[in-house]
């Protein structure tokens, strides 16, 4: 992999794969009642300050006690 490949846009297949991983990871995690509400609040705050509606959450790592979530924000031009 070269440095130029790092900045290359993903194809639709890679994007679909990432979304499927997110769905599967979410189903495997502990079902904490406040997690979905917290995600909604985070989205509202990000939209308030960036005017972006393109916000994605990704679960990076999950085990029985810890869930790591990455937030990807596409800023408008």
Swiss-Prot record:
Keywords: Cell cycle, Cell division. The keyword Transcription does not apply. Belongs to the MinE family. HAMAP family: MinE (MF_00262). This is Cell division topological specificity factor. Prevents the cell division inhibition by proteins MinC and MinD at internal division sites while permitting inhibition at polar sites. This ensures cell division at the proper site by restricting the formation of a division septum at the midpoint of the long axis of the cell. Transmembrane segments: none annotated. GO terms for biological process: cell division; regulation of division septum assembly. Coiled coil: none annotated. It comes from the Bacteria. The gene is minE. It comes from Helicobacter pylori (strain G27). Gene3D superfamilies: Cell division topological specificity factor MinE.
């Amino acid at each position: 992999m070269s440095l130029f490949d790092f900045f290359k846009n993903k194809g639709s297949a890679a994007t679909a794969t990432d979304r499927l991983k997110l769905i599967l990871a979410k189903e495997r995690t502990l079902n904490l009642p406040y997690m979905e509400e917290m995600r909604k609040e985070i989205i509202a705050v990000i939209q308030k300050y960036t005017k972006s509606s393109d916000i994605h959450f990704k679960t990076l790592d999950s085990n029985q006690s810890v869930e790591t979530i990455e937030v990807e924000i596409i800023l408008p031009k």
